[in-house]
Amino acid sequence: MSAIITIALSKGRILDDTLPLLAAADIEPEDDIKKSRKLIFSTNQPNVRLVVLRATDVPTYVQHGVADLGVAGKDVLMEHGYDGLYEPLDLKIATCRLMTAAMKGAAPKSGRIKVATKFVNIAKRYYAGKGIQADIIKLYGGMELAPLMGLADEIVDIVDTGNTLVANGLEPREKICDISSRLIANSASMKMKHASLQPILDKLAQAVGAE
């Protein structure tokens, strides 16, 4: 009997982009994930089930082996860290950029600066790497408001079109990295369940390459 494989999926935009890739890999939920209030879904493959989580929780579930595979944004993975995780595939979906931003036309501030972000670990590493002393302020959303209200000199946030920044009088400054969603695997699962996981990885790789 094949080992049960649990795949953790991120809610929202990433989920919408992930389902067609799973379908191309012959994995389809038996219920409509987008409409159902359930969080655990059986699939057309008797040994594969899907769980739908907050994006920031996906690496934790995979890291602890509760899920064997997961789909999460590179930003979430960089913030969480890779302990116990293996990243076999860039799914090339939900693409965007992680950038710094500040008030439009504002001169770069010398000395210690204040930075608002939900990506605290990434921001600490980024500014330290540039030799800039930065006080990092943790926020959970609405980053654009921080410079407007004088809470922060800069923000670190995900930028797609940049329209929200412009609408609030901000401008992007420096790109930290390009972001896309990645397939991650529990390191122990890759060894213990290799025979069951590798065919899924191969089919997903083919699906990504065919896009």
Swiss-Prot record:
User: What would be one Gene Ontology cellular-component term for the protein?
Assistant: cytoplasm
The broad enzyme category this protein falls into is transferase
Catalysed reaction per UniProt?
1-(5-phospho-beta-D-ribosyl)-ATP + diphosphate = 5-phospho-alpha-D-ribose 1-diphosphate + ATP
According to the UniProt entry, what is the EC number of this protein?
A: 2.4.2.17
Tell me the superkingdom of the source.
Answer: Bacteria
Q: Where in the cell is it found?
A: Cytoplasm
Looking up PROSITE patterns in the UniProt record yields: ATP_P_PHORIBOSYLTR (PS01316)
Task: Give the metabolic or biological pathway.
Answer: Amino-acid biosynthesis; L-histidine biosynthesis; L-histidine from 5-phospho-alpha-D-ribose 1-diphosphate: step 1/9
User: Which is an annotated GO molecular function term of this record?
Assistant: ATP phosphoribosyltransferase activity
Alphabetically sorted, this entry's keywords are:
Amino-acid biosynthesis, ATP-binding, Cytoplasm, Glycosyltransferase, Histidine biosynthesis, Nucleotide-binding, Transferase
Which Pfam families does this one have?
HisG
Q: Which GO terms describe its biological process?
A: L-histidine biosynthetic process
What is written about domains in the entry's comments?
Answer: Lacks the C-terminal regulatory region which is replaced by HisZ.
Subunit (UniProt): Heteromultimer composed of HisG and HisZ subunits.
Function, in words? Catalyzes the condensation of ATP and 5-phosphoribose 1-diphosphate to form N'-(5'-phosphoribosyl)-ATP (PR-ATP). Has a crucial role in the pathway because the rate of histidine biosynthesis seems to be controlled primarily by regulation of HisG enzymatic activity.
Per the record, the similarity remark reads:
Belongs to the ATP phosphoribosyltransferase family. Short subfamily.
What name does UniProt use for this protein? ATP phosphoribosyltransferase
